[in-house]
C-alpha cells in the first residue's frame, strides 16, 4: 500500500511539472513589448542617429510592428528597464536594428542602426 502511494505521488508530481512546463512555454511566446504603443519616447541619442541615418518615425514604427526580436542583441534582464533589439526591413528598403526599452513612462527608443551601412554620425 505504501509503495502504491509513493508511485501515485510521483505520477501526480510528474503531471504537475508537465503542466507547469506548458504554462511557461505559453507565457514565453508572449511578446515582451507593446508593438502598438500609442506614444514612443525618443532619446536624444536615438533622434541624432535617426537624423544622420535618414530614419523616419514611420520606419521606426514599421520595425516595432513587424520586426523580429534579436535576443542575442537584446538585454531582457537589464535593470531598471529591459532592452530589446528589433530588426527588419522598412518599406524604403533599409535594414534596421532599433533598440526599444519598455519602461513605466512608455516605450523608449534607445538607438537606431542601419545594418550593413556605415554612417558618419557625431552623436554623443
Residue ranges and their predicted role:
Residues 2-124:
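Ribonuclease/tRNase effector modules and their secretory precursors
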